[in-house]
């Protein structure tokens, strides 16, 4: 099929959706991930980090990298898709978007494999010294993905095009593909198929974990609680993948074909609308990832529970004090004025 060069689609609802949605994700994500780092720094000396905690800290750092660029995207979409900031910030935002997406996928994958080993080979896993392996795997993930993302620093990321009224030109950020570009199509095919390969591995590992946990005989109540938390962790990881990453990668390849001009106009508009929604879903991983930590580490969960309990008790005390003060005032109203004089 020959590429169609004559039409440019736009999904105008995104200029309302993204500023609102990204603002919510930014606030919740910064609070949640900053709290995670603070708890880890307070509860765990760095030398005592095991493999799973190393992966969790790295996943949090990847989320924060993306979160710091969200204000840039909020400004961009608030200005109707016109990049008014310096050009290098567009490159930086695109780079951090790529890093967050695929570092999150990679670290969730190694976290899943770690839990898979712990369930299927508990004795060997308990005896293994995994700290060095955790550091090495994290380093490999960062070097590989940051190296791939460096392409976005040298890419010509912006392009000028007329606004919707045709009265002036606006600057787009990462919204232009050369029509019929085979290298661009090849890159996207590689990314999409690599993602689904990793997703199938994660799905297999989690299904094995679920089957193993459900077929185990629970002897004591404590083991039942551990089993319940493990099942919740598996469900949470799968939920993050299915909600955040799968929709985006299902749409990505058809959307790329449409952007390159290999699809008709009606399909292009429909897939572009869907693509905007999947970008929103993709950003929610920064908020959902911290939930996984509650099921992975006992200290983290205990600390969070204590803080929530403390806040609830503080509100009760505050309310009780307020009610007591009101009662005292009401009682004083019934006391004769003369009796209050010395």
UniProtKB/Swiss-Prot annotation:
Entry-linked PROSITE patterns: G_PROTEIN_RECEP_F1_1, G_PROTEIN_RECEP_F1_2
Extracellular compartment: which residues?
1-16, 75-91, 156-184, 255-276
> Listed disulfide bonds for this chain?
90-173
Quote the tissue specificity entry: Found in oviductal epithelial and stroma cells. Levels in the oviduct are raised at days 2-4 of both pregnancy and of the estrus cycle. In the endometrium, localization is predominantly to the apical borders of glandular and luminal epithelial cells. Expressed at lower levels in endometrial stromal cells. Levels in the endometrium are increased at day 20 of pregnancy (at protein level).
Is the keyword Metal-binding assigned to this protein?
Answer: no
Q: Chief localization class?
A: membrane
Q: Name one GO molecular function term.
A: G protein-coupled purinergic nucleotide receptor activity
Q: Give the UniProt keywords, A-Z.
A: Cell membrane, Chemotaxis, Disulfide bond, G-protein coupled receptor, Glycoprotein, Membrane, Pregnancy, Receptor, Transducer, Transmembrane, Transmembrane helix
Listed SUPFAM superfamilies: Family A G protein-coupled receptor-like (SSF81321)
Indicate which residues are glycosylated according to the record. Answer: 4, 163, 169
**GO terms for CC?**
membrane; plasma membrane
Q: Which InterPro entries match?
A: GPCR_Rhodpsn (IPR000276), GPCR_Rhodpsn_7TM (IPR017452), PAF_rcpt (IPR002282)
- Spell out the subcellular localization from the entry: Cell membrane
Q: So where does this one cross the membrane?
A: 17-38, 55-74, 92-113, 134-155, 185-205, 234-254, 277-296
For side Cytoplasmic, which residue ranges?
A: 39-54, 114-133, 206-233, 297-342
| Topology relative to the membrane | Multi-pass membrane protein
Q: Which GO annotations describe the biological process of this protein?
A: chemotaxis; female pregnancy; G protein-coupled receptor signaling pathway
Q: How does it assemble?
A: Interacts with ARRB1.
Family indicated by similarity: Belongs to the G-protein coupled receptor 1 family.
User: What does the UniProt record say this protein does?
Assistant: Receptor for platelet activating factor, a chemotactic phospholipid mediator that possesses potent inflammatory, smooth-muscle contractile and hypotensive activity. Seems to mediate its action via a G protein that activates a phosphatidylinositol-calcium second messenger system. May be involved in the morphological and physical modifications of the oviduct and uterus during the estrus cycle and early pregnancy.
Annotated protein name in UniProt:
Platelet-activating factor receptor
Species source reads: Bos taurus (Bovine)
């Amino acid at each position: 099929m020959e590429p169609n060069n004559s039409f440019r689609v736009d999904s105008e609802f995104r200029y309302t959706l993204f500023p609102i949605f990204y603002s919510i994700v930014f606030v919740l994500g910064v609070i949640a991930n900053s709290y995670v780092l603070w708890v880890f720094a307070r509860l765990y000396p760095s030398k005592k980090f095991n493999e799973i905690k190393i992966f969790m800290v790295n996943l949090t750092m990847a989320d924060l990298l993306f979160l710091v660029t969200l204000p840039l995207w909020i400004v961009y979409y608030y200005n109707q898709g016109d990049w008014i900031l310096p050009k290098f910030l567009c490159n930086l935002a695109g780079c951090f978007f790529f890093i967050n997406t695929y570092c999150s996928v990679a670290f969730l994958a190694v976290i899943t494999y770690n839990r898979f080993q712990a369930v299927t080979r508990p004795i060997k896993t308990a005896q293994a010294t995994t700290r060095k392996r955790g550091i090495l795997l994290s380093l490999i993930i960062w070097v590989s993905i940051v190296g791939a993302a460096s392409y976005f620093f040298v890419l010509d990321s912006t392009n000028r095009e007329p606004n919707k009224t045709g009265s002036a030109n606006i600057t787009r950020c990462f919204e232009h593909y050369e029509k019929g570009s085979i290298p661009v199509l090849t890159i996207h095919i590689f990314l999409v198929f690599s993602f689904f390969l990793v997703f199938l591995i994660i799905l297999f590992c989690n299904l094995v974990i679920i089957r193993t946990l459900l077929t185990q005989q629970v002897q004591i109540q404590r083991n039942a609680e551990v089993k319940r938390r493990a099942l919740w962790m598996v469900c949470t990881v799968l939920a993050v993948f299915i909600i955040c990453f799968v929709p985006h990668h299902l749409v990505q390849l058809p959307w790329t074909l449409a952007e390159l001009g290999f699809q008709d106009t009606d399909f292009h508009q429909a897939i572009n609308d869907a693509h905007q929604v999947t970008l929103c879903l993709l950003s929610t991983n920064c908020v959902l990832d911290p939930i996984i930590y509650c099921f992975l580490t006992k200290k983290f969960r205990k600390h969070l529970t204590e803080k929530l309990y403390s806040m609830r008790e503080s509100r009760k005390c505050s309310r009780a004090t307020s009610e007591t003060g009101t009662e005292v005032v009401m009682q004083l109203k019934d006391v004769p004025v003369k009796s209050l004089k010395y």
